[in-house]
Curated annotation (Swiss-Prot):
Primary enzyme class: hydrolase
Gene of this entry: DNASE1L2
SMART domains assigned to the protein according to its UniProt record, in alphabetical order: DNaseIc
Annotated InterPro entries: Deoxyribonuclease-1_AS (IPR018057), DNase_I (IPR016202), DNASE_I_2 (IPR033125), Endo/exonu/phosph_ase_sf (IPR036691), Endo/exonuclease/phosphatase (IPR005135)
GO BP terms, alphabetized: corneocyte development; DNA catabolic process; DNA metabolic process; hair follicle development
Factors inducing expression: Up-regulated by inflammatory cytokines.
Protein name: Deoxyribonuclease-1-like 2
Gene Ontology CC: one annotated term: extracellular region
SUPFAM superfamilies registered for this protein in UniProt: DNase I-like
Superkingdom: Eukaryota
Active site, UniProt feature: E99, H170
Record localization: Cytoplasm; Secreted
Task performed by this protein: Divalent cation-dependent acid DNA endonuclease involved in the breakdown of the nucleus during corneocyte formation of epidermal keratinocytes. May play an immune role by eliminating harmful DNA released into the extracellular environment by damaged epidermal cells.
Species annotation: Homo sapiens
Bridged cysteine pairs (disulfide): C209-C245
Length: 299
């Protein structure tokens, strides 16, 4: 997967569609499983939301046999003119409660190159990141040298196509500070493993209100380092209910990726307003809104 022919096909598809952009979202769909996807109202709206993205992370997937995911993919492919596929993690969690990370992607826009589950040597994460490398249109410029644990042997740089690495996190609320900080260690691990720093960290970080307070940010390396650009501001509200919290975030790094960010495209996707739902109807879908960003690429 992800070879020159696949990349060329993706570029042709983007050219034919009259766009050179990649819309990426992250959606915590509360307790996603068979009952939610089989509900006609919920299932159809979820499918339409995800079909609006070229690449989307879904969290809180509770579907070990992938029956709900299979049904979801059928619904997405029935409402979209493009064909979608998926890649998912194993069920993750420290106790009997498990969740999966799910990436849904448009096959003519990106392809999966490689995946791995972060080993989490310090056991910081309740649900360790399932890291996925996608092939995407390149920006054509060579990136500067990357930081690495192996100071004397910098990792190799991608020679042609840009590889876009997505790192998901659904943080345990009361461990959010430690888990968000530990994403910096994931960043170093990806550089050592794959030799690229073009990464998006995304998901429900629980990064606001009582879980991450203003005084906590200084201890979070992912926030204090200038390497990372936080795209969803602290002032955002990513919750459907009456709270006002910026739980869901997208963080970018890598010179080429940061140059590819479409200005002002990072936003909260208010599906309640989009579909004309009342709060009860919206909460039946999820207690979180998706967050998103668009990457633009040179033709």
């Amino acid at each position: 997967m992800g070879g020159p022919r696949a990349l060329l096909a993706a570029l042709w598809a983007l050219e034919a569609a009259g766009t050179a952009a990649l819309r990426i979202g992250a959606f915590n769909i509360q307790s996603f499983g068979d009952s939610k996807v089989s509900d006609p109202a919920c299932g159809s709206i979820i499918a339409k939301i995800l079909a609006g993205y070229d690449l989307a992370l879904v969290q809180e997937v509770r579907d070990p046999d992938l029956s709900a995911v299979s049904a979801l993919m059928e619904q997405i492919n029935s409402v979209s003119e493009h064909e979608y596929s998926f890649v998912s993690s194993q069920p993750l969690g420290r106790d009997q409660y498990k969740e999966m990370y799910l990436f849904v992607y448009r096959k003519d826009a990106v392809s999966v190159v490689d995946t791995y589950l972060y080993p989490d040597p310090e056991d910081v994460f309740s649900r360790e990141p399932f890291v996925v490398k996608f092939s995407a249109p390149g920006t054509g410029e060579r990136a500067p040298p990357l930081p690495s644990r192996r100071a004397l042997t910098p990792p190799p740089l991608p020679a042609a196509a840009q590889n876009l690495v997505l790192i998901p996190l659904h943080a345990a609320p009361h461990q959010a500070v430690a888990e968000i900080d530990a994403l910096y260690d994931v960043y170093l691990d990806v550089i050592d493993k794959w030799g690229t720093d073009d990464m998006l960290f995304l998901g429900d970080f629980n990064a606001d209100c009582s879980y991450v307070r203003a005084q906590d940010w200084a201890a979070i390396r992912l926030r204090s380092s200038e390497v990372f650009k936080w795209l969803i501001p602290d002032s955002a509200d990513t919750t459907v209910g009456n709270s006002d919290c910026a739980y869901d975030r997208i963080v970018a790094c890598g010179a080429r990726l940061r140059r590819s960010l479409k200005p002002q495209s990072a936003t909260v996707h208010d599906f309640q307003e989009e579909f004309g739902l009342d709060q009860t109807q919206a909460l039946a879908i999820s207690d979180h809104f998706p967050v998103e960003v668009t990457l633009k690429f040179h033709r």
